[in-house]
């Protein structure tokens, strides 16, 4: 990370940094515990150790439901297992649900990723497959949101025999970057803010550079998150969770930066590769009707997979975080898909 703006300072400044940046893995653990205590169904939270010494923080809900294909949920950029709290009980009513912090995010290990787009992507995918092997999951219904959707698709290209149904929720990184600016959807304020600080720094570097003002920045730029989870939390629990997830060593964030082009696009767009997924893998794409993501991608995927099952749909009243904007509708749609599998 020698050429990043986030080099660790030396000497007296390095000992002062923990006070300047009010975060720690312990604080992330504590705020996540407040979130997970809202679960009604039986759950198990633990580290899954991979052969390469990395650890993947994993939450399994309803582990006793062993008769059906499990649902595996992969969060998006800057997220973690806690953001599925509005969905986990409902979606684990009839089957086991697994979710985990992606390598480099949340409470999982934060190793150094390859600096090239393909290498970074492969590292993510390899960690998901090794996690699956270690967990002993033969097949799964694989759901990914945003960056998680991009990685779930990449995984399905490489390991199609493990995926009973691929569910992509407002997936990032599919279309090619338009050459005509008029074809680009206007991004929300927080995306513009991230884009404005890009360059040599990581996307969320501002949270770490801001020190004690970092938590306030989350609340300022993403006040919608507090509203989305208001049924569960009246305080700043979710804002705190997002801050502590992203104020740590920016390992996965650096990998994402290697994979992206101007935040909204991928250097290796998935539309150029989605045809490589085996024909018998069904795909459902779920978008928020008000998302900043290009929803025409669903129709383009259908065109590229004429002999395969591809369904795309939009949920009214939802933006990019469909699962939190309209959780009841989202849960019903995903449950219907899962029931079609078994």
UniProtKB/Swiss-Prot annotation:
Reported function: Lysophospholipase selective for N-acyl phosphatidylethanolamine (NAPE). Contributes to the biosynthesis of N-acyl ethanolamines, including the endocannabinoid anandamide by hydrolyzing the sn-1 and sn-2 acyl chains from N-acyl phosphatidylethanolamine (NAPE) generating glycerophospho-N-acyl ethanolamine (GP-NAE), an intermediate for N-acyl ethanolamine biosynthesis. Hydrolyzes substrates bearing saturated, monounsaturated, polyunsaturated N-acyl chains.
UniProt entry tagged with the keyword Lipid metabolism: yes
Top EC class of this enzyme: hydrolase
> Which keywords are on file for this protein?
Hydrolase, Lipid degradation, Lipid metabolism
Q: Which gene encodes it?
A: Abhd4
Carries keyword Repeat? no
GO terms (BP aspect): lipid catabolic process; N-acylethanolamine metabolic process; N-acylphosphatidylethanolamine metabolic process
What phenotype is described for loss of this gene? Homozygous knockout ABHD4 mice are born at the expected Mendelian frequency, are viable and healthy, and show no overt differences in their cage behavior compared to that of wild-type littermates.
Q: Which organism is it from?
A: Mus musculus
The entry sums up its family as follows: Belongs to the peptidase S33 family. ABHD4/ABHD5 subfamily.
Pinpoint the AB hydrolase-1 domain residues: 70-323
List the Gene Ontology MF annotations in alphabetical order. lysophospholipase activity
- Catalytic activity from the UniProt record: N-hexadecanoyl-1,2-di-(9Z-octadecenoyl)-sn-glycero-3-phosphoethanolamine + H2O = N-hexadecanoyl-1-(9Z-octadecenoyl)-sn-glycero-3-phosphoethanolamine + (9Z)-octadecenoate + H(+); an N-acyl-1,2-diacyl-sn-glycero-3-phosphoethanolamine + H2O = N,1-diacyl-sn-glycero-3-phosphoethanolamine + a fatty acid + H(+); N-hexadecanoyl-1-(9Z-octadecenoyl)-sn-glycero-3-phosphoethanolamine + H2O = N-hexadecanoyl-sn-glycero-3-phosphoethanolamine + (9Z)-octadecenoate + H(+); N-octadecanoyl-1-(9Z-octadecenoyl)-sn-glycero-3-phosphoethanolamine + H2O = N-octadecanoyl-sn-glycero-3-phospho-ethanolamine + (9Z)-octadecenoate + H(+)
Indicate what this protein is called per its UniProt record: (Lyso)-N-acylphosphatidylethanolamine lipase
């Amino acid at each position: 990370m020698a050429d990043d703006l986030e080099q660790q300072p030396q000497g007296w400044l390095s000992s002062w940094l923990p006070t300047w940046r009010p975060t720690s893995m312990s604080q992330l653990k504590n705020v996540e515990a407040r979130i997970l205590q809202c679960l009604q169904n039986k759950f198990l939270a633990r580290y899954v150790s991979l052969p390469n010494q990395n650890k993947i923080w994993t939450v399994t809900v309803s582990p006793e439901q062993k008769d059906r294909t499990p649902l595996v949920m992969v969060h998006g950029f800057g997220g973690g297992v806690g953001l599925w709290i509005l969905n986990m009980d409902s979606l684990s009513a009839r089957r086991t649900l697994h979710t985990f912090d992606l390598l480099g995010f949340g409470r999982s290990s934060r190793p150094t990723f390859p600096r090239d787009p393909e290498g970074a992507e492969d590292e993510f995918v390899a960690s998901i497959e090794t996690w699956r092997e270690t967990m002993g999951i033969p097949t799964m219904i694989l759901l990914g949101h945003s960056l998680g959707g991009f990685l779930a698709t990449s995984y399905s290209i490489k390991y199609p025999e493990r995926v009973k149904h691929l569910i992509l929720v407002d997936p990032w990184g599919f279309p090619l970057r338009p050459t005509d600016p008029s074809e680009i959807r206007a991004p929300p304020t927080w995306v513009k803010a991230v884009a404005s600080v890009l360059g040599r720094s990581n996307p969320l570097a501002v949270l770490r550079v801001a020190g004690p003002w970092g938590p306030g920045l989350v609340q300022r730029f993403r006040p919608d998150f507090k509203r989305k989870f208001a049924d569960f939390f009246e305080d700043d629990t979710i804002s705190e969770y997002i801050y502590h997830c992203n104020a740590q060593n920016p390992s996965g964030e650096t990998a994402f930066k290697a994979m992206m082009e101007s935040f909204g696009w991928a250097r290796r767009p998935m539309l150029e590769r989605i045809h490589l997924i085996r024909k018998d893998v069904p795909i459902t794409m779920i978008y928020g009707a008000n998302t900043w993501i290009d929803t025409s991608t669903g129709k383009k995927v259908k065109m590229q997979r004429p002999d395969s099952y591809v369904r795309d749909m939009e949920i009214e009243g939802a933006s990019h975080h469909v699962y939190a904007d309209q959780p009841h509708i989202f849960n019903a749609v995903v449950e219907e898909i899962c029931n079609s599998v078994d």
